[in-house]
Amino acid sequence: MRLFAFLWSSVAFLSTVQAQVSQTASQTQDDSSTPTPTPTDKYVNIADALRTKTPMATPNRTIMPTRQDPRATEPPTPEPTYLPTPSPTPAPTPDPGPWVAKWMDHDQVQPFKQPDPVTVSEKAAVKFKPQIHITNGCHPYPAVTWWGETSGGLKTKGAPSAGCKGSGWGSQVYGRSTWVKGVWAIMYSWYFPKDSPSTGLGHRHDWEHVIVWIDNPDIENPKILAVTPSAHSGYSKQVPPSADCVDGTSVKVKYESKWPINHALESTTEGGETQDLIMWNQLSENALRAMNSVTWGDANCPFCDGNFQAKLDKAWPF
């Protein structure tokens, strides 16, 4: 029964819908001569709205300055202070060992050039540099080179001046000075390849020196107080020196042998020659080592460390 009622209701509904459709079609044909107004949409088409969307005006925005970091006003943290790295302790200078003498021909030894004086003592030494007159025997020669090579000297044969009439390289006078009991002493020394009054007499090598004693090297006009030339391990003394034995500020000495006695220095009135002066503290290190180490046979270097003070004490003229 229920099924029958449902079917009847469905048929009635379909009949009603068909009648409405027929009526609508008839009205459409009657009104075809007049334009059909476009119905107003009740709903918004979202797709069309998105395509025609007016862009929103961007408001002018004032960018506020960035707030300053308050930490920037604080003083910067100082860099840490580190202690300096200590320099490594230099290795000790190795002991060069004993000096080995390096001999060379006497006429091949080159002298030191005389330096310009700088110190008070150097200026005084140049000012009072003596002159030497060779009466007989050898002329003075350089004894040591810058490298520490030393003169081999000459045998005692031939005439007193045989083979030693002067070096082609030039000669040399060696100086050293100091205070002795309130007096300034300047020692000037010469080297000779041999000391031979005649053939077969004397010995290889010779050193002679004169000491000039002055009051004070550091005053405008120092005065010569005494002169002590060397003679056979001793000294002759002039206190004060004779005016005839001094040329300005240069004392005059002669190198002479009174046969058969060996050569020695004496004060003289005869003029002589001067040589380039090199002071002890101006010698090279090797030259100093050589002068302090080399033995010269029967001759003695008077200004080396082992002899200098003893010679001054012995020559004291006052």
Swiss-Prot record:
Highest taxon above the source species: Eukaryota
Signal peptide (UniProt feature, chain positions): 1-19
Composition-biased stretches (Low complexity): 23-41
Keyword RNA-binding: no
Motif (Hepta-peptide GHRHDWE motif II): 202-208
Compartment annotation: Secreted
Glycosylation (residues): 60
Keywords from the named record: Glycoprotein, Secreted, Signal, Virulence
Coiled coil (UniProt feature): none
Entry's free-text remark on domains: Key residues/motif important for the effector activities are degenerated in most NLPs, including the nlp24 peptide consisting of the conserved region I (11-aa immunogenic part) and conserved region II (the heptapeptide GHRHDWE motif) that is important for phytotoxic activity.
Positions of short motif Conserved undecapeptide motif I: 185-195
Source taxonomy: Eukaryota, Sar, Stramenopiles, Oomycota, Peronosporales
GO cellular component term of the entry, any: extracellular region
Bias kind Pro residues: ranges: 73-96
Upregulation: Expression gradually increases to a maximum at 7 days after inoculation of pepper leaves.
Function: Secreted effector that contributes moderately to virulence during infection by P.capsici. Does not cause visible reaction of C.annuum for several days after inoculation, but by 7 days after inoculation, small necrotic lesions become visible. Leads only to chlorotic areas, without necrosis at 7 days after non-host N.benthamiana leaves infection.
Spans annotated as Disordered: 23-42, 51-96
Name under which the protein is recorded: NLP effector protein 7
Cysteines paired by S-S bonds: none
Family statement: Belongs to the Necrosis inducing protein (NPP1) family.
Biased composition (Polar residues): 55-65
